[in-house]
């Protein structure tokens, strides 16, 4: 094709992409079904991972839950089984009420499987993934959610904690994707969800290791998405989830300027997951929560660095992590004193 003609074709496609994006904001797209599909969630024992598990259970997915904490993972599984029982009871009641079978969702083998896995250890991931393939089947939806935070200033943070943060928050995404992507490529079907953070799009002081891990996983996700497009594997979808501070306790103590905080409070975990689920089930490539994060990210990319610093100071975002770090340090000192260290 002549380059001039191709240029106008590309221009039209770019403008059309803007039209489609605007339409998605105005008209909610229809959600796809994940009923009967195998959905694997890392870090499922608590926080967002647990809530993701409950949301996928309500949509009749077959769940595979990974967490390093066996007890909390089993607690999540118990909640999932309770949802499954309610769904089965509702289906039975609907049949007794005389509803046609076509009005009831098709029956699925509703099961939940739990695995204790440290996603920060490559061999552990590969071995557990092999067990999943043998005991459950191939994974259709992969939700890379597991995450940790050290809570130390850079010069006070032990090297081992820095490495741990990078392994769990970033490297683990490589290992899980390498484990389950090959089959997705073979059948050209699947969905990979990357739970990152707004701190993977812009940073702040005091969490260098966490920001580096989240920036890294955002880059990984974007490159993977481009690779799938280049391979014309349009049946494999990807969704990048970048929430603002979520009130799960992970960053307890983090505070922005008190006059600003009522307008930008920590997100409720339920709200965050529901927004992410909407994006996943409508094949949205990326979701930032709240939407203000899109503007912040855009401003950061066009403003001079000193202008960004001024904005951070005005919002109280420049040292927002300091109270959180101080609380972590105090808790560590208390534990050491309690244990006689």
From Swiss-Prot:
GO MF term set: all-trans-retinol dehydrogenase (NAD+) activity; all-trans-retinol dehydrogenase (NADP+) activity
Compartment(s) where it occurs, according to its Swiss-Prot or TrEMBL record: Microsome membrane; Endoplasmic reticulum membrane
Keywords in alphabetical order: Endoplasmic reticulum, Lipid metabolism, Membrane, Microsome, NADP, Oxidoreductase, Signal-anchor, Transmembrane, Transmembrane helix
Catalytic site: 210 (proton acceptor)
Function of the protein: Retinol dehydrogenase with a clear preference for NADP. Converts all-trans-retinol to all-trans-retinal. Has no detectable activity towards 11-cis-retinol, 9-cis-retinol and 13-cis-retinol. Required for normal embryonic development.
Membrane-topology annotation of the record: Single-pass membrane protein
Family membership: Belongs to the short-chain dehydrogenases/reductases (SDR) family.
Chain positions recorded as NADP(+) binding sites: 40-64
Tissues expressed in: Detected in retinal pigment epithelium (at protein level).
A GO biological process held by the record: retinal metabolic process
Catalytic activity: all-trans-retinol + NADP(+) = all-trans-retinal + NADPH + H(+)
Protein's UniProt keywords contain NAD: no
Pathway involvement of the protein, from the record: Cofactor metabolism; retinol metabolism
Organism name: Mus musculus (Mouse)
Name this protein carries in UniProt: Retinol dehydrogenase 10
SUPFAM superfamilies in the cross-refs: NAD(P)-binding Rossmann-fold domains
Broad class of enzyme this protein falls into: oxidoreductase
Binding residues annotated for substrate, in chain numbering: 197
CDD domains for the chain: 17beta-HSDXI-like_SDR_c
């Amino acid at each position: 094709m002549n380059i001039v003609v191709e240029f106008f074709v590309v221009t039209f496609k770019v403008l059309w992409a803007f039209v489609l994006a605007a339409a998605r904001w105005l008209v909610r797209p229809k959600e796809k079904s994940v009923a009967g599909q195998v959905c694997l969630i890392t870090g499922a024992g608590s926080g967002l991972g647990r809530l993701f598990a409950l949301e996928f259970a309500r949509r009749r997915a077959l769940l595979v839950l990974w967490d390093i904490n066996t007890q909390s993972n089993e607690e999540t599984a118990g909640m999932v089984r309770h949802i499954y029982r309610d769904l089965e009871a509702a289906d039975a009641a609907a049949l007794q009420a005389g509803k046609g079978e076509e009005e009831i969702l098709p029956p699925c083998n509703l099961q939940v499987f739990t695995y204790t896995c440290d996603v920060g250890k490559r061999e552990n991931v590969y071995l557990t993934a092999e067990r999943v393939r043998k005991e459950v089947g191939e994974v259709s939806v992969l939700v890379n959610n597991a995450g940790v935070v050290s809570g130390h200033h850079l010069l006070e943070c032990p090297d081992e904690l820095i490495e741990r943060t990078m392994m769990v928050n970033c490297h683990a995404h490589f290992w899980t994707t390498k484990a389950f992507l090959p089959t997705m490529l073979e059948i050209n079907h699947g969905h990979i969800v990357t739970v990152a953070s707004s701190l993977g799009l812009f940073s702040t002081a005091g969490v260098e290791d966490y920001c580096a891990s989240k920036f890294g996983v955002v880059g990984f996700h974007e490159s993977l998405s481009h690779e799938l497009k280049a391979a014309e594997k349009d049946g494999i979808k990807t969704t990048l989830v970048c929430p603002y501070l979520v009130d799960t306790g992970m960053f307890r103590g983090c505070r922005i300027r008190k006059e600003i905080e009522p307008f930008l409070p920590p997100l409720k975990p339920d709200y965050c997951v529901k927004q992410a689920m909407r994006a996943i089930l409508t094949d949205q490539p990326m979701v930032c929560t709240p939407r203000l994060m899109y503007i912040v990210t855009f401003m950061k990319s066009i403003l001079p660095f000193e202008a960004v610093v001024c904005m951070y100071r005005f919002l109280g975002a420049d040292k927002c992590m300091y109270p959180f770090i101080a609380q972590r340090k105090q808790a560590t000192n208390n534990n050491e004193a309690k244990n006689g260290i």
